[in-house]
């Protein structure tokens, strides 16, 4: 059973529709695959691989010859896979969580990094897969990249909260393994590479260069430096999260206890990670499964499905293995060499990163309550009436649900970090007394 699939006035040819997809309002599609919870209305899809939560709602939107997931396609968004030479032979990838603004356009082949915002027309075949959470914006017929800018966007965080709530699958046997995490080995590995790339650009082109060239895009000097800072904050947040999860609620009375809590619990996890249309998994594990299938002619689909489910269940254990593998690079120590003092420093770095990113979200949300945002209110009244109308509809900034959530998140995470620091300081005192 594929769950609830709506097919009202939809024209489809040679398509596979996953669980809880919603297709309606004269949508047309051919030669395409839709994973679960996709929503498609009014527009058109031609030869696409639509991962979970691919959403296109507008009559003028075309998705063609691309791989997408967790996509929000704006009205008039389209791509071209034909350069009028050898036919429609080109294709592209827009990695998970990206948004295309109204009238955006990409000339395939191209590759866009995870959780990116695409605005304007891009015809020079950019590859921004190494720069997740970025803005890709056209200005003066050039593609400008703003690395990491989406990390401080309210919209990105709201999307991450909405996706799990919008899982409409009713079948207890959920066919797609979906990991909703914004920060994972998959995105953090790209940020680490991004930091190296951005620092390399500074060294090769000079720190005072006004602009830098990267994969058919232009990065402004200020954007490059902010990108390094944002990626660094995100890595601190992710690494700290992983360590705190390991020690949360876990009593330890001496150093041996502490290191026992930090031991690896899965042999898999090192190396590159990939996004298999919702399933975030180590690449080597998938390669091993492919080798098993090739070497076993009697292999069944059920066995492969069991493999995917097992990888999904083991995610956090494999994630910890990956985190430990990059500790020498990030902290200069292996996990078994971490002292209580080291962990206290890591937790403080984590707390600073969490609060810094949350304050950026807070400031981003405030823009929605600015004077410019009030222009559409009040119809024909005075400024005072306009402000009154705005407040009746939108409420006050401090009372906004998202703003309250950000403030509470800062409080909760600070308390969580302080609780662990207190326990570690008590351990240090205990060790020194002996």
Where would I find each of the regions flagged by the language model?
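Short, small-residue-biased leader/transition segments that mark boundaries at the very start
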Residues: 2-6
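Terminal amphipathic alpha-helical/low-complexity segments used for targeting or macromolecular assembly
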Residues: 129-434
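Glycine-rich phosphate/diphosphate-binding loop of Rossmann-like nucleotide-binding domains
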Residues: 9
């Amino acid at each position: 059973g594929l769950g609830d699939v709506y097919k009202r006035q939809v024209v489809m040819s040679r398509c596979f529709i996953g669980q809880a997809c919603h297709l309606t309002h004269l949508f047309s599609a051919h030669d395409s695959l839709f994973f679960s919870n996709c929503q498609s209305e009014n527009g058109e899809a031609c030869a696409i691989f639509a991962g979970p939560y691919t959403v296109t709602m507008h009559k003028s939107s075309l998705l063609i010859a691309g791989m997408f997931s967790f996509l929000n396609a704006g009205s008039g968004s389209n791509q071209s896979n034909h350069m009028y030479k050898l036919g429609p032979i080109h294709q592209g990838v827009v990695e998970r969580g990206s948004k295309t603004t109204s009238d955006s356009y990409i000339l395939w082949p191209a590759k866009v990094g995870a959780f990116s915002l695409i605005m304007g027309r891009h015809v020079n075949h950019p590859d921004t897969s190494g720069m997740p959470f970025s803005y890709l914006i056209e200005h003066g017929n050039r593609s400008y990249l703003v690395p990491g800018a989406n990390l401080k966007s309210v919209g990105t965080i709201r999307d991450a909260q909405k996706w799990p709530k919008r899982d409409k699958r009713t079948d207890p046997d959920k066919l797609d393994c979906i990991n909703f995490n914004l920060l994972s080995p998959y995105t953090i590995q790209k940020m680490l590479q991004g930091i190296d790339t951005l620092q390399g650009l500074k060294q090769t082109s000079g720190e005072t260069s006004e602009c830098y060239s990267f994969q058919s895009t232009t990065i402004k000097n200020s954007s490059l430096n902010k990108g390094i800072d944002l990626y660094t904050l995100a890595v601190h947040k992710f690494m700290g999260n992983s360590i705190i999860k390991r020690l949360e609620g876990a009593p330890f009375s001496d150093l041996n206890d502490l290191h026992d809590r930090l031991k690896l619990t899965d042999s898999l996890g090192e190396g590159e990670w990939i996004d298999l249309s919702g399933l975030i998994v180590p690449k080597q594990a998938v390669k091993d499964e492919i080798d098993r299938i090739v070497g076993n002619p009697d292999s069944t689909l059920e066995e492969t499905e069991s493999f995917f489910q097992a990888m999904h269940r083991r995610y956090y254990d494999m994630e910890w293995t990956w985190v430990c593998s990059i500790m020498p690079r990030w902290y200069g120590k292996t996990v078994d060499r971490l002292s209580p003092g080291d962990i206290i420093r890591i937790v403080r770095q984590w707390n600073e990163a969490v609060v810094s990113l949350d304050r950026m979200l807070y400031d981003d949300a405030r823009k929605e309550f600015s004077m410019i945002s009030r222009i559409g209110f009040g119809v024909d009244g005075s400024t005072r009436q306009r402000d009154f109308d705005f407040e009746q509809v939108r409420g006050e900034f401090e009372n906004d649900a998202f703003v309250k959530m950000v403030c509470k998140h800062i409080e909760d995470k600070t308390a969580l970090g302080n609780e662990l620091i207190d326990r570690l300081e008590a351990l240090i005192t205990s060790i020194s007394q002996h």
